[in-house]
Amino acid sequence: PHAYPFLSPEQKKEL
């Protein structure tokens, strides 16, 4: 699971 589920898919892509 992602640590930032509240972020948009684009934001998670930067992570």
Curated annotation (Swiss-Prot):
It catalyses: beta-D-fructose 1,6-bisphosphate = D-glyceraldehyde 3-phosphate + dihydroxyacetone phosphate. In vertebrates, three forms of this ubiquitous glycolytic enzyme are found, aldolase A in muscle, aldolase B in liver and aldolase C in brain. GO terms for molecular function: fructose-bisphosphate aldolase activity. Plays a key role in glycolysis and gluconeogenesis. Keywords: Allergen, Glycolysis, Lyase. This is Fructose-bisphosphate aldolase A. Its EC number is 4.1.2.13. Tetramer. Belongs to the class I fructose-bisphosphate aldolase family. Pathway: Carbohydrate degradation; glycolysis; D-glyceraldehyde 3-phosphate and glycerone phosphate from D-glucose: step 4/4. One of its GO terms (biological process) is glycolytic process.
